[in-house]
């Protein structure tokens, strides 16, 4: 996959003719995947490259930083997902005021100069200054630019529109299963293990204390989750705590994971943490003994859930 990370690089590139999926794609959720998939099908049928034109920063980060929504994934994960979706050319550039000021016509003319022959777009995406570029404009003006338009309606899952906004709401409410259903994969956070206060070890449940890689991630509702953690290319079941440890005063928000059946040193390692189900909300305990008993119950529940999911996965493969 060819990766282009700036407008200057795009202008200088010599690209083969392509069909381009346009979008912020800030979650690469099932709705986004449908737009990309429709564009991919057209590209393969017409011997074109599959391009995705997207942004490495959310548009609001430069236009109205105070309104920028929490991120659903980092850029490294976004690039990885695009590779898995069969993208040939990924234009993943920062959204700047220069782009915001570009008219819809100028934006489409730029795409045509880059060899774009068809455009895939979701019904709710807009582009160009003032958001004047949209599906309606493309459908009425596409012949002027020599473009084929591949539009997709909003996707619904169990009656709910699949959107980054709804996924953020689900995560904030601790409904990570609903978020996963809309994402098409478990919600995942990447982080690097840093030294903690060692309280988990004293309680019999040593934890990896994560410093998140990237800023402004969507943080799930505080509580304990069953999850999985990727360490050195291997997945381990885990129970994950998100919160500020109310039993111990004056703690900042943190994410800590206790990995089952892992006993080596994790300090400095980069981990991918998937949250599968919220087991309970965060609680304050009157004693360390009561906290320890609850942690044992959390571990039992998490391991039972992970075993059940593993069994379902095995049956699905048969």
Question: Which role fits each region the language model picked out?
Answer:
Residues 9-13, 97-100, 156-160:
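A short acidic, often aromatic-flanked loop/helix-cap motif at beta-alpha or helix-coil junctions
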Residues 61-145:
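N-terminal Rossmann-like or analogous alpha/beta NTP/dinucleotide-binding catalytic cores
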Residues 142-241:
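Glycine-rich, Lys/Arg-enriched anion-binding loops that position phosphate/diphosphate groups
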Residues 196-318:
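Phosphate/ribose-recognition catalytic cores of enzymes acting on nucleotide-derived substrates
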């Amino acid at each position: 996959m060819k990766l282009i990370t700036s407008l200057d690089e795009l202008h200088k590139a010599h690209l083969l003719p392509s069909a381009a999926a346009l979008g912020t794609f800030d979650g690469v959720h099932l709705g986004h995947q449908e737009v990309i998939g429709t564009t991919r099908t057209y590209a393969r049928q017409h011997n074109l490259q599959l391009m995705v034109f997207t942004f490495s920063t959310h548009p609001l980060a430069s236009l109205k930083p105070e309104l920028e929504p929490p991120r659903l994934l980092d850029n490294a994960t976004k690039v990885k997902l695009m590779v898995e979706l069969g993208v040939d050319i990924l234009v993943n550039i920062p959204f700047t005021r220069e782009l915001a000021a570009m008219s819809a016509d100028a934006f489409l003319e730029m795409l045509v100069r880059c060899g774009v022959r068809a455009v895939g777009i979701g019904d709710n995406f807009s582009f160009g200054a003032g958001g004047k570029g949209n599906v309606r404009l493309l459908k009425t003006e596409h012949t002027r630019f020599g473009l084929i338009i591949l539009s997709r309606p909003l996707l619904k899952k169990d009656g709910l529109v699949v959107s980054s906004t709804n996924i953020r709401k689900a995560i904030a409410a601790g409904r990570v299963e609903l978020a996963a259903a809309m994402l098409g994969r478990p919600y995942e956070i990447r982080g690097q293990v840093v030294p903690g206060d060692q309280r988990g070890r004293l309680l019999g449940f040593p934890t990896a204390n994560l410093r998140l890689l990237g800023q402004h991630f969507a943080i799930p509702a505080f509580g304990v989750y069953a999850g999985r953690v990727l360490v050195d290319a291997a997945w381990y079941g885990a129970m994950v705590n998100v919160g500020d440890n109310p039993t111990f005063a004056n703690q900042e928000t943190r994410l800590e994971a206790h990995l089952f059946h892992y006993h080596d040193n994790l300090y400095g390692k980069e981990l991918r943490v998937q949250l599968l189900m919220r087991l309970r909300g965060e609680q304050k305990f009157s004693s360390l003994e009561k906290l320890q008993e609850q942690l044992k119950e959390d571990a039992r529940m998490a391991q039972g859930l992970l075993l059940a999911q593993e069994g379902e996965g095995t049956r699905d493969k048969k």
